[in-house]
Amino acid sequence: MDEPMVDASGAQVKVTFTTTEADLQLPESKRQLLVPADIRRYGLSRVLNSESMLDTGSIPFDFLVNGSFLRTSLEDYLTNNGLSLESNLTLQYVRSLIPPVYEASFEHDDWVSAVDVLSASSPSGRWSGDNFQRGQDRILSASFDGLLRIWNASGQVIATSPSGSHGGHTASIKAAKFLTNSQLASAGMDRTVRVWKYTESDHFSGDLKPTLELYGHTGSIDSLEVDGASKRILTASADGSIGFWSTSKASAPEADSSLLPNAHTSKRRKVTTSVTAAQRGPLSLMPIHSAPASAAVFDPRDRTVAYSASQDHTLRTIDLTTSTVVTTHSTSHPLLSLCALPRGNSASPLLAAGTAARHITLVDPRASAATTSVMTLRGHANKPVGLCASPRNEYALVSGAHDGTCRVWDLRSVRPATQEEGGLGSVSEAVYVIEREGAKGGKKTVAGEGCKVFGVVWDAELGIVSGAEDKRVQINAGRDVVAE
């Protein structure tokens, strides 16, 4: 064991350092140490980074004690938990989550319903292959005014989609995603999915051209997920159905003629547009929910598997090759949002689902799972309607909610549920809260009044990007939210 460190009072605490991070393991002989009782997180980080320990320079660390992050001195922790200075504390060290810092806001004419990012490290950037040029990051926003906008990182609008009379959406857009740097998809209250070709003549101006209209849903489409590699789209609709679509005109089946825009319009009132895009139907339309379907996502490792969440309280696993439900997990509340969290080498992800009860429930979708809910994330004061996994850390995710905040969660920080919370299972609380910049300091009679967050994405290059009722896209630097 290393030589003991002594503080001014002379009090010391024996600690044992552990970690699950393979590249940060200490030799067995260095894992136990006597440290000053008044030492805090920063001091412990310095100890670990020192030449005699990890010799890692200046990596910021957080420390978990019995599942909770250390936020006081060791002495205060011992006192607060009824422990003596003679106790041997086991400290699990992890790379810190660094506070996301506000960077910019992009103004819109109406509420911003959805956002996405195209960057070198984003899924769409990777699907673009060599066609994507590093440094040409783009932000996609969808709005209740029925328009899509593509921005550069400096806040300049590069392209805006045409209006409904020119081939665009005829009602509010609820979801939008980049497929590649030259293709994107959107969907909304006009019950259609639209695929767009995106081109740039230079780095400051571009063009969005509708190439495909997909018909099948009979209700608003509130969620859209894409896989650029397989050219497939998943949708979740208020009609209770999950849609599975192709972005290729050649492989997409014909659309149901009764759902096309002119199907119920007299010859005198035919809807005409100046742009004609091909009209197609779904590869599969699965009416598997008894209430509005809120979200659908692909399995991170197996794109033939999908998961859906619904206001009917269920989360379902779908085999896309046969369009059948494999498993159904029932929950206690209507589900409003969904994201899949990859788990190390595990074949199955962990699913995070936002609920109408204002919390986020983590679900193990495996049929063999002993319990449906693995953990509950608590802290939002209104409905969490947007979720996104960290691009770099399998334990972290961000949520956006109608309380006007985005919250960053670290799943390694866990405590038992209190009696007020039902007394069962594990609970995690947000490590950081991101407020809307324009609402800071203002008092709201209802949580999130005027600034409800509708969508959020976490990108390794640009950070945490969110869209809200305040008619703004907000960027909070997140490149180093997870310390390297």
Swiss-Prot record:
Q: What are the alphabetically sorted keywords of the record?
A: Nucleus, Repeat, Ribosome biogenesis, rRNA processing, WD repeat
Note the segments forming the WD repeats. Answer: 122-161, 168-206, 216-255, 288-328, 330-373, 379-419, 448-484
Q: Where is this region: Ubiquitin-like (UBL) domain?
A: 13-95
GO BP terms, alphabetized: chromosome organization; maturation of 5.8S rRNA from tricistronic rRNA transcript (SSU-rRNA, 5.8S rRNA, LSU-rRNA); maturation of LSU-rRNA from tricistronic rRNA transcript (SSU-rRNA, 5.8S rRNA, LSU-rRNA); protein-RNA complex remodeling
Residues annotated as coiled-coil are: none
Of the GO CC terms on this record, one is: preribosome, large subunit precursor
Tell me how this protein assembles: Component of the NOP7 complex, composed of ERB1, NOP7 and YTM1. The complex is held together by ERB1, which interacts with NOP7 via its N-terminal domain and with YTM1 via a high-affinity interaction between the seven-bladed beta-propeller domains of the 2 proteins. The NOP7 complex associates with the 66S pre-ribosome. Interacts (via UBL domain) with MDN1 (via VWFA/MIDAS domain).
Q: What does this protein do?
A: Component of the NOP7 complex, which is required for maturation of the 25S and 5.8S ribosomal RNAs and formation of the 60S ribosome.
Indicate the family of this protein.
Belongs to the WD repeat WDR12/YTM1 family.
* Protein's recorded name: Ribosome biogenesis protein YTM1
Species, as recorded = Chaetomium globosum (strain ATCC 6205 / CBS 148.51 / DSM 1962 / NBRC 6347 / NRRL 1970) (Soil fungus)
